[in-house]
Design a protein with these regions (language model features):
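A structural preference for short, pocket-lining loop segments at secondary-structure junctions
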Residues: 1-33, 51-61, 84-89
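Glycine-rich beta-to-alpha active-site loop
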Residues: 48-97, 127
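C-terminal long alpha-helix characteristic of the crotonase
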Residues: 83-88, 139-191, 207
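A short acidic, glycine-rich active-site loop
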Residues: 31-43
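Well-ordered beta-strand positions
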Residues: 80-82, 120, 124-126, 132, ...
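Hydrophobic, secondary-structure "cap" segments at the distal end of domains
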Residues: 106-116
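Hydrophobic/aromatic residues within transmembrane alpha-helices
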Residues: 13, 25, 74-76, 133, ...
């Protein structure tokens, strides 16, 4: 559903206690036989990330479960990310299975974690613990401590997210203009990504996952 700023002034993205988002469904990608099918899948992810970045109001993620690949990108497309302690992991594994990270997605990553962490996070395919993720900028703030249950930590994070959202909403147009000024126009022919998906090397890597 299209985000309408007139009807909704803020967005809070919350997964469950096990998974924030695992990204694209590899089974759907593997079963796709036509380039149009793959184009639709990757295009949907691109449109979702663009909607988060272009939404004038605050977009805040609460990450209490695994945030992998496209799920990690979704979190990074948020303006602020709350995390919590747990055994879940967060990271980008696209390169390990031969999937391109286009410039528009790299722009989202760089904007969120800074260029000093971009190369490692984008190329080494590491899966970070919540504490490690915070050090790399994948998470802005961890709610609770190691003995805080996820249900309680999620409740606390939701309250903090609502307060932060109100702060940004009350800031008004200066926040909207600042957010828009941080957007980078990046042109990329997604057909390159789609063609690479069908390459023998990528297909072999995906099958081994």
């Amino acid at each position: 559903k299209e985000l309408n700023y007139n009807e909704c002034k803020a967005v809070i993205i919350l997964g469950n206690e096990k998974v924030f988002s695992a990204g694209l469904n590899l089974k759907d990608l593997m079963s796709a036989k036509e380039t149009s099918e793959v184009s639709l899948i990757f295009g949907t992810l691109r449109d979702l990330l663009t909607a988060c970045r272009e939404f004038p109001g605050p977009v805040i993620s609460i990450i209490g479960g695994h945030a992998i690949a496209g799920g990690c990108l979704l979190a990074l497309a948020s303006d602020y990310r709350y995390g919590m302690h747990g055994t879940h992991r967060m990271g980008l594994n696209e390169m390990a299975i031969g999937i391109d990270l286009p410039p528009d997605m790299l722009s989202i990553i760089s904007h969120s974690i800074g260029r000093e962490n971009l190369f490692e996070v984008a190329t080494q395919c590491r899966m970070y613990t919540p504490s490690q993720a915070k050090k790399k900028g994948l998470i802005n703030e961890i709610i609770g401590h190691r003995l805080t249950g996820k249900k309680k930590a999620t409740s606390q994070a939701l309250e903090e997210a609502k307060k932060l959202a109100k702060f940004y909403i009350d800031a008004g147009e200066p926040f909207v203009r600042l957010k828009q000024s941080l957007m980078h126009d990046t042109n990329f022919d997604y057909q390159v990504l789609i063609d690479n998906w069908f390459s023998a090397d990528t297909q072999e890597k995906v099958k081994s996952v």
